[in-house]
């Protein structure tokens, strides 16, 4: 966050015409740095959550616009059910410091509820906690769902969660292309 704030403040000091903020942290830093310079966001899942807008109307009502990277959660849940029809317990694994991840988890849970699938959230506050959280999740779940979550993505790819479930089938569900390249994607 500190680096993003420094960069955003440098843009404001340079009086740039437009700021392109890539990801939630950058968007939040830019939003805090200026209310005048137009900001375009990208790789932001939910603007209302990222900007703490409680009465969301579909626009921010300020100098910020952009695109969302949210893939339809109902379709993700449908795919999970189709690929793993025997799944009874889904672990939802995310970093509690990422507001957009919490948003996705909460929304995804609604679809699991509709299909009568039990779930439990497993959160890590930072990358130091992920190993033990993944271990707990693999002990609970038939399938692990990981929303778009940069902290979790980096750690799960770096330290394969499959190490925690040796000699057992391990299934993950997520929507990031890096999961796919490493064989951890639906």
Regions found by a protein language model. Give the residues of each.
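Short hydrophobic alpha-helices and adjacent helix-cap/hinge residues
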Residues: 1-186
């Amino acid at each position: 966050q500190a680096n993003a704030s420094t960069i955003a403040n440098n843009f404001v000091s340079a009086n740039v015409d437009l700021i392109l903020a890539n990801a939630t942290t950058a968007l939040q830093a830019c939003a805090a740095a200026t209310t005048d310079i137009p900001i375009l966001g990208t790789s932001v899942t939910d603007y209302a959550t990222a900007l703490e807008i409680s009465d969301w109307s579909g626009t921010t009502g300020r100098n910020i616009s952009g695109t969302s990277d949210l893939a339809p959660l109902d379709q993700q849940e449908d795919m999970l059910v189709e690929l793993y029809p025997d799944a009874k317990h889904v672990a939802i694994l995310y970093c509690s410091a990422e507001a957009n991840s919490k948003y996705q988890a909460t929304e995804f849970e609604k679809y699991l509820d509709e299909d009568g699938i039990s779930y439990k959230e497993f959160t890590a506050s930072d990358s130091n906690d992920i190993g033990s959280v993944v271990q707990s999740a693999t002990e609970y779940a038939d399938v692990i769902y990981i929303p778009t979550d940069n902290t979790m993505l980096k750690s799960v790819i770096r330290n394969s969660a499959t190490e925690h479930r040796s000699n057992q089938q391990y299934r993950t569900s997520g929507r990031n292309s890096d999961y796919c390249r490493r064989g951890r994607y639906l």
